[in-house]
Amino acid sequence: MPLARLVEGEKHDECTYVAASSLLIGRHKMLRSLIYASRRWSSSVGARFSSREELQAYLARPAWQPEDYLPSAEDIARQQLSEEETRKLLKLSGLPEADIQEVRRRLATQLSFVSQLQSVEVDDCADPQYAKAMQRHPAAIGYEELVRRAELDAKDTSLGEKSGSWDSTATATLKKDGYFVLREGLLQKR
């Protein structure tokens, strides 16, 4: 029964209200689907591709070139490290000091590239449709919340993890309530 026929003040049974509300819900769903379809088909980005080859040709055409983001010769010269700094970095990383000049050039290129990446402005208000699942600025948690999360953390048995399987004091000769016991004499012999 259409809702227009339900007149205020008249007595109607429960079935009449159920039928009327289901009709209203059905119309609401139909309207929503029509609005969605009209939004989907009314917006246009460009002409449709007529063939698969046309689509592949469009996708094969680059929209940007890597050279646009690589540093210029001036940037490389400005970012180049001294020989001492390069030797120190090679020593710290355990790499051989074979061709210092080539390593300096590569490091300068990489530093210039990183500088260019850091200079790109990033809008902090991302569109929620494209935002990642992680929050950009997660709130700090307290000690109690950390302990609660650690207790709720389930072990992955497929990786061989067993809950409560590690006892740090199992091999200790002196222990009490899960703690190591140290004698004063051991501390003085240091």
Curated annotation (Swiss-Prot):
Molecular function as annotated in GO: ATP binding; glutaminyl-tRNA synthase (glutamine-hydrolyzing) activity
- Short name of one Pfam family: GatF
Catalytic activity of the protein: L-glutamyl-tRNA(Gln) + L-glutamine + ATP + H2O = L-glutaminyl-tRNA(Gln) + L-glutamate + ADP + phosphate + H(+)
Query: What are the subcellular locations of this protein?
Result: Mitochondrion inner membrane
How the protein sits in the membrane?
Peripheral membrane protein
Q: Offer a single GO CC term for the protein.
A: mitochondrial inner membrane
Q: Name one GO biological process term.
A: mitochondrial translation
Q: What is its EC number?
A: 6.3.5.-
Q: Which key words are in the record? A: ATP-binding, Ligase, Membrane, Mitochondrion, Mitochondrion inner membrane, Nucleotide-binding, Protein biosynthesis
- Give the enzyme's main class according to its UniProt record, as a single word: ligase
Just give the chief location class.
Answer: mitochondrion
Q: Does the keyword Membrane apply?
A: yes
Q: What does this protein do?
A: Allows the formation of correctly charged Gln-tRNA(Gln) through the transamidation of misacylated Glu-tRNA(Gln) in the mitochondria. The reaction takes place in the presence of glutamine and ATP through an activated gamma-phospho-Glu-tRNA(Gln). Required for proper protein synthesis within the mitochondrion.
Record text on subunit structure and interactions: Subunit of the heterotrimeric GatFAB amidotransferase (AdT) complex, composed of A, B and F subunits.
Q: Which family does it belong to?
A: Belongs to the GatF family.
Q: What else is known?
A: This protein may be expected to contain an N-terminal transit peptide but none has been predicted.
Tell me the protein's name.
Answer: Glutamyl-tRNA(Gln) amidotransferase subunit F, mitochondrial
Q: Which organism is it from?
A: Eremothecium gossypii (strain ATCC 10895 / CBS 109.51 / FGSC 9923 / NRRL Y-1056) (Yeast)
Gene that encodes it: GTF1
